[in-house]
Amino acid sequence: MNLCADSSTGELALFQGQDGGSIPTSAHQFIVRPISKLTANRFIERHHYLGITPFLSTYRYGAYFGDLIYGAIAFGTPNATDISGLFSKNNQDGVLEIKRLAMTDSAPKNSESRFIAISVRLLRREYPLRLLVTYADSSLHVGTIYKASGFEYVGLTATKCDFWVNGKINQRGKVSHLDGKWVPRSQKHLFLKSFSP
């Protein structure tokens, strides 16, 4: 498969056959490029099961076919308490997390794993990536795309609870004065992928 990089635009173009039609029929037809926070958030809000639940990201990429975006991926620094059992506090340089990954339902088979691979190649041009962390919600997924992308399965995370008030998660602050309840959160499948410098 031909890969060509255009370092001036930060794009990594995937081979696109002639007369490919107006919709992608192969994951190889996408062009992956950096996108703005706004573009990523709008796409993720529409296509990710969590919607726009707050998350912090530093690097974001989109999968395009022509002018249409079919996927968005966001990378950011992992929450230090979430990965504290994996590394010492002084050993977290070069560690990022896939904060969100979303693709349209009309994206061709294997699009997610290919999109991850190309996005990581672009990311490594901007950031000295040593380790990539990602999670799959055990109530919805088993992490097939991460396994297909070469991630190592570590296991399930510890059970956590969220405080719910009026049908919504109370994200921050004191809860003792609120009329709500603690609800167990589904565990997450934890995956890691390491990279040599």
Which residues fall in each region the model found?
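Acyl-donor binding region in acyl/amide transferases
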Residues: 31-35, 76-183
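Short beta-strand-to-coil "C-cap" segments at the C-terminal boundary of structured domains/repeats
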Residues: 192-197
